[in-house]
Swiss-Prot record:
Protein's name according to its UniProt entry: Acetyl-coenzyme A carboxylase carboxyl transferase subunit alpha
Classification via NCBIfam families: accA, AccA_sub, PRK05724.1
Record's catalysed reaction(s): N(6)-carboxybiotinyl-L-lysyl-[protein] + acetyl-CoA = N(6)-biotinyl-L-lysyl-[protein] + malonyl-CoA
Coiled coil: none
Alphabetically ordered keywords of this record: ATP-binding, Cytoplasm, Fatty acid biosynthesis, Fatty acid metabolism, Lipid biosynthesis, Lipid metabolism, Nucleotide-binding, Transferase
């Protein structure tokens, strides 16, 4: 797959194109230019490190939405075995913006639930761009309650712009569905591990992100509203999105300082989409450790810790 570069990555894109051209020349001729290719590759890596070491919140927001980032189904394929997808909410329909089912993690049975976006236009429409309707959240809850019934740990992956705000979704009880999930997650009697892998958009993300451990990938975001939405409300123009991103504190490092996130999972150079394999290794290492810890804690203590975490939400600072 040809890499897609964001606006602020254009200097990297230019170097990458030069490297590709030189590789083509080397393949088509007897001239040895491997030293020049190596020099440009090192220059590209150094430039990438420099750019990504000082990303603004607005730029991190762009990375979190990168069209080539790994999605929930990519994590399921890489981290789990024997995945059996479960469908429907048993009330209205099957929402493809939420995927989930039974799987094995290191041989242990678990329930996996997550948002799913699409790669191409057809798939994006089918998945509703990763924005669940009420039936999606009710499906997620059905799966999590099934996990509770059989004593299976729950692992969730969060990547959504937010819950779908359409009229039909509101008529079918969007806010009730999200609220019900939040209520049930506070007392679900199994370990719950949550990982934000891309966008963590408002209540649409929170509805599957209340757990004993909450992780974020290094270049993911988590906020009550998108920077563009915030800018449109406060400044009446989306052009102020960069200012909104700064004020909202949407980045993993910022949220960890506020004790809203347990672990920030390091991403490969250039973002998770540049090296799926390394990303999966990093995520798996964290989930293995946390699952072991969660299962060693008495259930009553686990639930008490989870409740205390939720009650601590809403702190604010005037700084």
């Amino acid at each position: 797959m040809k890499p897609v570069f964001l606006d602020f990555e254009q200097p990297i894109a230019e170097l990458t194109n030069k490297i590709d051209e030189l590789r083509f020349v080397q393949d088509e001729s007897a001239v040895d230019i491997s030293d020049e290719i190596h020099r440009l590759q090192k220059k590209s890596n150094d430039l990438t490190k420099s750019i990504f070491s000082k990303l603004t919140p607005a730029q991190i927001s762009q990375v979190s939405r990168h069209p080539q980032r790994p999605y929930t189904l990519d994590y399921i394929e890489a981290l789990f075995t024997d995945f059996e997808e479960l469908h429907g909410d048993r009330h209205f329909a099957d929402d493809y913006a939420i995927v989930g089912g039974l799987a094995r993690f290191n041989g242990q049975s678990v329930m996996v639930v997550g948002h799913q976006k699409g790669r191409d236009t057809k798939e994006k429409i089918r998945r509703n761009f990763g924005m669940p309707r009420p039936e999606g959240y009710r499906k997620a809850l059905r799966l999590m309650k099934t996990a509770e019934k059989f004593g299976l740990p729950v692992m969730t992956f969060i990547d959504t712009p937010g819950a779908y705000p359409g009229i039909g979704a509101e008529e079918r009880g969007q806010s009730e569905a999200i609220g019900k999930n939040l209520y049930e997650l506070t007392r679900l009697r199994v370990p719950v591990l949550c990982t934000v892998i891309g966008e963590g958009g408002s209540g649409g993300a929170l509805a599957v992100a209340l757990g004993d451990y909450v992780n974020m990938l290094q270049y993911s975001t988590y906020s009550v509203i998108s920077p563009e939405g915030c800018a449109s409300i406060l400044w009446k123009t989306a052009e102020k999105a960069a200012d909104a991103a700064q004020a909202l504190g949407i980045t993993a490092d910022r949220l960890q300082k506020l004790d809203l996130v347990d672990t920030v999972i390091k991403e490969p150079l250039g973002g998770a989409h540049r090296d799926f394999g390394q990303t999966m290794k990093n995520v798996k290492a964290v989930l293995e450790k946390q699952l072991h810890e969660a299962q060693s804690i008495p259930l009553a203590d686990l639930l008490s810790r989870r409740f205390d975490r939720i009650m601590a939400y809403g702190k604010f600072s005037e700084q």
